[in-house]
């Protein structure tokens, strides 16, 4: 039995994926990390999304437990935890892109020009991951 088995309601792949990322806050935290380079509890707490501290703490622990993020203390700051997306977490980039595009066309236009003017989703996907990795590589 894997650690993820307790999250799943049934054997349906879509339902299983939603059991992991389908709550109100998980993809918000991933989006904050991926697109806005948020890394600390304080940065997440101060975001426009207004995530309650208890919910944020729970989501960060869950994301770490299932391998979407890792928690580290930086050499120059041993007091603050920094959170980084793993390859598994980065694999949600296409989901974030699709949700943003769907919202742009059906609910609310996005103010991110990269997303609003996307011509090639795969190219955008790779650019977002490269930007994330380049911003976190120096830490």
Locate the predicted segments by residue.
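Recognition helices and adjacent regulatory flanks at domain boundaries
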Residues: 1-10, 20-24, 46-47, 100-102, ...
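Short, contiguous, well-ordered secondary-structure segments
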Residues: 1-3, 7-8, 17-20, 32-33, ...
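N-terminal helix-turn-helix DNA-binding core of bacterial DNA-binding proteins
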Residues: 12-55
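Basic, amphipathic "hinge/linker" alpha-helix immediately C-terminal to the N-terminal HTH DNA-binding motif
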Residues: 22, 75-99
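A general structural signal marking secondary-structure boundaries and capping sites
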Residues: 37, 67, 103-107
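Canonical helix-turn-helix DNA-binding module
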Residues: 45-74, 78
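C-terminal regulatory/oligomerization modules of transcriptional regulators
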Residues: 94-139
């Amino acid at each position: 039995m894997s650690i993820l088995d307790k999250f799943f309601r049934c054997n349906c792949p879509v339902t299983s994926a939603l059991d992991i990322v389908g709550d109100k806050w998980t993809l918000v935290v991933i989006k904050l990390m991926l697109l806005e380079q948020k890394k600390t509890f304080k940065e997440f707490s101060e975001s426009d999304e207004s995530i309650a501290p208890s919910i944020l703490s729970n989501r960060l622990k869950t994301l770490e437990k299932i391998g979407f993020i890792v928690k580290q203390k930086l050499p120059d700051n041993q007091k603050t935890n920094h959170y980084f997306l793993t390859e598994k977490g980065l694999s949600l980039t296409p989901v974030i892109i699709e949700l943003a595009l769907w919202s742009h066309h059906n609910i609310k236009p996005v103010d991110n020009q990269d997303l609003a003017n996307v011509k090639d989703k795969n190219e955008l996907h790779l650019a977002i991951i490269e930007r994330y990795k380049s911003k976190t590589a120096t830490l």
